[in-house]
Amino acid sequence: MKPFPRAEISRKALKHNLARLHELAPSSKVMAVVKANGYGHGLLNVAQCLDNADGFGLARLEEALALRTGGVTAKLLLLEGFFRIGDLTTLVEHDIETVVHHESQLEMLESINLTKPVTVWLKVDSGMHRLGFSPAQFDATYQRLMANDNVAKPIHLMTHFACADEPSNPSTAEQQRVFDTLIKGLPGDRTLANSAGALFWQQSQADWIRPGIALYGVSPVFGDLGAKHGLMPAMDLVSQLIAIREHKAGESAGYGSYWTAEKDTNLGVVAIGYGDGYPRNAPLGTPVLVNGRIVPIVGRVSMDMLTVDLGIDANDKVGDLAVLWGKELPVEEVAEHIGTIAYELVTKLTPRVAVCLD
């Protein structure tokens, strides 16, 4: 018996999206970003499905170790880098590469003797102003890494775009100009483009692209759809109706009597709530798909349940499926209705939601 609620993950869609990104960046290798539990799609499941990716990007060392333990032998890169000096020996032992973005990491690399050098990606802050060395710091930082026997050569080079998901924003081109000027003539691989860079800034694709959300069939642009770019949604978040009740005009529903019916109708209770990661702040009218039609959320989302207005002529039954987002109800549309981004919806699902690979 299949569990509810569950996130149904499509192998076909994941593989299609990776192939599509290869088409969009034919001269680049693809570092598939699978941090945050594969954007909620299952870390190991996604990595094993995308076994023809050229490498995988993670945020935390624990994520990388989970992939190694699961048998993944591909290139792994810690996008946040290492946090503690003891992490360096673990990186060497498990052949994990690291971003270097801060003075404290330089100091740790200079105060340890590793059994073999670690592969480093030096991060330039070209305008994001979150992680990375400023243009003024770059030359001295690069020379320190070059002089360090704990650092494998050549040193690879990277930056991250702040506004690539705004295709008309000129700051992305300026960030690329800053980066290209700094690293001109240096050896090593380059990577600039995230999902938005890969989709909208072909000139930024370089040696590697680092797609995250696009791998899962979702557009990185608010109000846009992945399908417009040839991507396929990889997740269907589904649950079921556990109760249907007749509801009279003037009756309220849910905590705080937040919603009151204007006319007679039928309400359906769906077994999913904020305890599963569905947003409590989903407003009235947020769409849910039941038996092929869109029905609106009414009342407040509670911990384990939410309520939808099925309509007066509903023929739905207890046990029928309710789709919170997926192929027929894009997560981008749900996110826009709620006032958030699709990234947040897919990554905030809790362990109560079973992740099922088809």
Curated annotation (Swiss-Prot):
Keywords: Isomerase, Pyridoxal phosphate. The active site is at K35, Y255. Its EC number is 5.1.1.1. GO terms for biological process: D-alanine biosynthetic process. The keyword Cytoplasm does not apply. Its cofactor is pyridoxal 5'-phosphate. Transmembrane segments: none annotated. Substrate binds at R130, M303. The keyword Isomerase applies. Pathway: Amino-acid biosynthesis; D-alanine biosynthesis; D-alanine from L-alanine: step 1/1. InterPro entries: Ala_racemase, Ala_racemase/Decarboxylase_C, Ala_racemase_C, Ala_racemase_N, Ala_racemase_pyridoxalP-BS, PLP-binding_barrel. Coiled coil: none annotated. The modification N6-(pyridoxal phosphate)lysine is found at K35. One of its GO terms (molecular function) is pyridoxal phosphate binding. It is an enzyme of class 5 (isomerase). One of its GO terms (cellular component) is cytosol. Belongs to the alanine racemase family. This is Alanine racemase.
